[in-house]
Amino acid sequence: MIFYFSGTGNTKWAASKLASATHEDLISIAPYMRADDSSHTLAEPFILKENERLGFVFPVHGWRVPKLVREFIGKMKVQRAESDAAENSASAGSKALSDAAESKALSDAAESKALSDAAESKALSDAAESKALSASAGSRPFVYCVCTAGDSIGLTIENLNEVISQNPSLQALGITEVKSSYSLIMPESYVGLPFMDVDPKEKEIWKKSKSAQKLAVICEEIFDRKEGVSRLVKGPIPWFFTKVVGGFFENVLITDKRFHVEKDKCVKCGICANVCPVGDIKGGHGEYPEWLHHKDCLTCFTCYHHCPHHAIKFGNQTQKKGQYYFK
């Protein structure tokens, strides 16, 4: 089971490759968090099949896990499939029969060989403890994370593990952190600051090529459930960028209030409203787009990058800047 969030498509590409490699379900987080969509709900638990991996794939926002993804992980419920419960029940029944046979054999042996009751009891207790420890060790799902970023990720994985460790549903499955984590350097898409723009075409192509090679290795390791891998580009002073700069991003820069449309360029096609992952835009079908100013906007710039006429602006920060989405 792979949970992913994607704006401009970098992460969806990576998540899709992982789904193909592991033959596991791909689940988009965005529909469960949209204010305008009641067809998805977090009230019902997600069912984790027998031996299924649990993956989280998302872009890095401000050297952190995106706020929407953190909220989703904090609220989600995960349970094992009923077949697992049935198997455990059958295993318990089999164990009971085995224990009964074992008890009879020991009783017969005790009668014929005059074994002490104390020795027999200890042998059975040790066997039961060994079986319990073995079952417990094999019950935890393999949990991993792949995050995409234009550059470094800071303490994003530490940020993720903190959220995971506080989810009671995941705790019940023995999950308190990811077992392996990876970052992929992908083409830039954040254009909300004066010094930030999309990559030149040559660099975009190079990043995609390198990431495709790295993702192939990641897919193999995740398929094999390889634990203890931490292949991350944290960058310099990771705590500063996640704690200080990341806090500034969330508190000041994540807002839809600076978005506007140049009406002489806009054709009212509605593409921006359709691609917004959180449903924060209404428009199209003959109407200019309007940002709804609800709290879920991530300033992911998906609307900006998908506008076919480059009519969407973010204050004065996007003047003469490029557009990018994964193709």
Language-model segments: residues:
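Active-site-proximal loop/hinge segments that shape catalytic or ion-binding/gating pockets
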Residues: 324-327
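PRPP-associated nucleotide enzymes
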Residues: 39-41
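A mid-sequence, solvent-exposed acidic-amphipathic segment
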Residues: 236-270, 274
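FMN-binding flavodoxin-like domain, especially the glycine-rich phosphate-binding loop
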Residues: 2-4, 8-25, 30-33, 45, ...
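Generic structural signal for beta-strand residues in well-ordered domains
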Residues: 4, 47-48, 136, 252, ...
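Iron-sulfur cluster-binding cysteine motifs and their immediate structural context
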Residues: 261, 267, 271-292, 296, ...
